[in-house]
């Protein structure tokens, strides 16, 4: 087992990894940017080093700076968390070349899934179901029109190197297709440095369901069940749950088998996720995330398996002790991503200082957070404040606990999307499990009224707290003022006494 691990990340995931390391008896090293010098992860770790200015390109994406700290701190391994360098094959190779273990999959697996076109070719060969579309890059508009007419409009044009919905556009006719392809290429070139695009059949109302994998360096690979991730905004997940409300044992077995085929096709040897789109009884490969997912928490809650500790053990060379038949799904878990953003203003990010912070608790409540009262939410990174997770014996109990926990949650100083989550958890379609990746835009008109109500509750709470703080501060100010006058008088008397002496 490792003696010391560097965490090349920030926020809640850095703290999650620190906790896993401590439970395994491993010392931790944090890295932080100048904007994060007072961050919780930097304070919590056994050692912490500044790696550069606030912009991620000069700090959390600075491979040389991270490796210099790893060498200085004499670590054994590096965990990338998610985001930043987590799915960068060159970083994984650089870590190994420098003599450290990379706590994640082998670089070849990362690289294989980094290109969507390449990933589709691998999945087709492995027998994993694919969305109908082009087999490779689109070279010219005539070819694109021919493919689109063969599979039927609407079609979606995607960037091969893309992620998070960037470089993705829908065309409903051949007249639209040319413009959409040009736009997608320009966005892909600007965002990813690669203008390559491809075409797929556009699924009108799919669900986003993913399968959690766990593989080791000895050829073993298992799946840990499914997660429902359909509640999204601009292809960014907001609410996740395990298992999916529509999941059956038969469907889970089929999707699990497909995910394992995907993992085996690239010799996968860590925690990873195979994402599928599901519609009308069929599921199709979307992409594979070669890292720990933000939403790994709900899988941990329903399986009892610590995924971060498993990643560390696998990287240290340990063999999986679990067999597929050992994995049991018990109960239901839901995760709400608590972000510093305004859901009533198109979810615009709201960086700033948290003036008061009180997290919820009670039965079945877990919170993975990287903040505290007085902490700054900087504008340079993702706006996520925390992940709120609830667990219950049933979906209904998990929802009831989440509603309670959201009601208890107090964050004052920055706007958050808590009103959005509270509104969703009362909406009829969500409660029935009738959701898709278009849920937010399809139901926003219904959600808005309740979001306003809950936002006003937050504002009223802020007013009450501010008034109490003001009254308290007035008393403190008066006490300090009196003490200052007293000290000043003593100092004057001392000056007189000293002079006389």
Swiss-Prot record:
| pH curve summary | Optimum pH is 8.5.
MF terms in GO: ATP binding; metal ion binding; pyruvate carboxylase activity
Write down the EC number: 6.4.1.1
The kind of enzyme this is, by top-level EC class, is ligase
Q: Which cofactor(s) does the record list?
A: Mg(2+); Mn(2+); Co(2+)
- Does Lipid biosynthesis appear among the keywords? no
Quaternary structure and partners: Heterooctamer of four A and four B subunits.
Task: State what protein this is by name.
Answer: Pyruvate carboxylase subunit A
* The organism of origin for this protein: Methanocaldococcus jannaschii (strain ATCC 43067 / DSM 2661 / JAL-1 / JCM 10045 / NBRC 100440) (Methanococcus jannaschii)
Q: Name the lineage.
A: Archaea, Methanobacteriati, Methanobacteriota, Methanomada group, Methanococci
């Amino acid at each position: 087992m490792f003696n010391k691990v560097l965490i090349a990340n920030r926020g809640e995931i850095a703290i999650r990894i620190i906790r896993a390391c401590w439970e395994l008896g491993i010392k931790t090293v944090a890295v932080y940017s100048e904007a994060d010098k007072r961050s919780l992860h930097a304070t919590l770790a056994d050692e912490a080093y500044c790696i550069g200015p606030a912009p991620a390109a000069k700090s959390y994406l600075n491979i040389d700076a991270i490796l210099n700290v790893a060498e200085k701190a004499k670590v054994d391994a590096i965990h990338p968390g998610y985001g930043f360098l987590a799915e960068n094959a060159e970083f994984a190779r650089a870590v190994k070349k420098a003599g450290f273990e990379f706590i994640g999959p082998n670089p070849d697996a990362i690289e294989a899934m980094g290109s969507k076109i390449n990933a589709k070719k691998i999945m087709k060969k492995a027998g994993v179901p694919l969305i109908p579309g082009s087999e490779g890059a689109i070279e010219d508009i005539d070819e694109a029109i021919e493919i689109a007419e063969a599979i039927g409009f609407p079609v979606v044009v995607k960037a091969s190197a893309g992620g998070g919905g960037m470089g993705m556009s829908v065309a409903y006719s051949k007249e639209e297709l040319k413009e959409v392809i040009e736009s997608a290429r320009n966005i892909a070139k600007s965002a990813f440095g690669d203008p390559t695009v491809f075409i797929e059949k556009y699924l009108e109302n799919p669900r986003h369901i993913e399968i959690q994998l766990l593989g080791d360096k000895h050829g073993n690979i298992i799946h840990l069940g499914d997660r429902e991730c359909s509640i999204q905004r601009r292809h960014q997940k907001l609410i996740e749950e395990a298992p999916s409300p529509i999941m059956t044992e038969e469907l889970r077995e089929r999707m699990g088998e497909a995910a394992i085929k995907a993992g085996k096709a690239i010799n996968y040897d860590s925690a990873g996720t195979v994402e599928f789109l599901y519609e009308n009884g069929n599921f199709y490969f979307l992409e594979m995330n070669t890292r720990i997912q933000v939403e790994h928490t709900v899988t941990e809650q329903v399986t009892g398996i610590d995924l971060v500790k498993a990643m560390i053990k696998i990287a240290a060379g340990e063999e999986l002790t679990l067999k597929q038949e050992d994995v049991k799904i018990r109960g239901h878990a839901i995760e709400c991503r608590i972000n510093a953003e305004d859901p009533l203003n198109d979810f615009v990010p709201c960086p700033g200082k948290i003036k008061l912070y009180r997290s919820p608790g009670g039965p079945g409540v877990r919170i993975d957070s990287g903040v505290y009262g007085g902490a700054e939410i900087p504008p340079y990174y993702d706006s996520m404040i925390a992940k709120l997770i609830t667990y219950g014996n049933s979906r209904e109990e998990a929802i009831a606990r989440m509603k309670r926990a959201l009601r208890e949650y107090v964050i004052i100083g920055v706007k958050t999307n808590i009103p959005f989550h509270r509104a969703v958890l009362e909406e009829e379609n969500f409660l029935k499990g009738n959701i898709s990746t278009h849920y937010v835009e399809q139901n926003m008109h219904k959600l808005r009224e309740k979001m306003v109500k809950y936002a006003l509750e937050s504002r009223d709470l802020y007013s009450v707290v501010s008034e109490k703080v003001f009254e308290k501060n007035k008393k403190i100010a008066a006490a300090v003022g009196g003490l200052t006058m007293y000290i000043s008088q003593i100092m004057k008397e001392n000056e007189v006494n000293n002079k006389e002496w």
